Amino acid sequence: EDNVKPGDTVLDMGTGSGILAIAAAMLGAEVRTVVDIDENCLRTAQENAEKNHVSIGRGLCGDALRDEKLAEDIGSGYSVIVANIVADVIIGMAPMFFAKTAEGGTLICSGILNERADEVRAALEKAGFEVVNHAKSDDWSAFTAKK
């Protein structure tokens, strides 16, 4: 809630059920794109958005790390990127996240086991992000980073 405001443009990488995209839309953000490697997740996310009377933009399916066309189709200039995915994927995507985030924009990544948090933080910083918050809950970590 503290990082998403009305008018923000949002990309949700690894959308799953769409919960983060839906929350962003409910906060007044313009969710432009949701991405997942599973077509069923994209369908579920769209259904959940409809049930909540919000739009979560276009759904793209595939592996953005391996599919250059998909990576290009995702676009760039997002004021907020949310990603609730495992540490290895966040580490691999950190440079892509940086490239797709608008200047002054925010990356919020979660789904990170605490024992992998230092690796994720290092990858985000190496990509050019400034980590501004590291939240922990039980075995899990989340980072907020600025470009």
Task: List where the protein language model places each region.
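Core SAM-dependent methyltransferase catalytic element
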Residues: E130-K147
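Conserved short alpha-helix immediately C-terminal to the canonical SAM/SAH-binding motif I
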Residues: N40-T44, V89, R116
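A short SAM/SAH-binding and catalytic strip from SAM-dependent methyltransferases
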Residues: S79-I91
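Short strand-turn motif at the edge of the Rossmann-like AdoMet-binding core
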Residues: I85, C109-N114
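A short acidic, Gly/Pro-enriched loop at the edge of an enzyme's catalytic core
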Residues: E68-V80
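Conserved SAM/SAH cofactor-binding pocket of Class I
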Residues: E1-A64
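A short glycine-rich, Lys/Arg-flanked "PGG" loop and its adjoining helix->strand segment in the class I
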Residues: I91-T106
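Short alpha-helix
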Residues: E115-A127
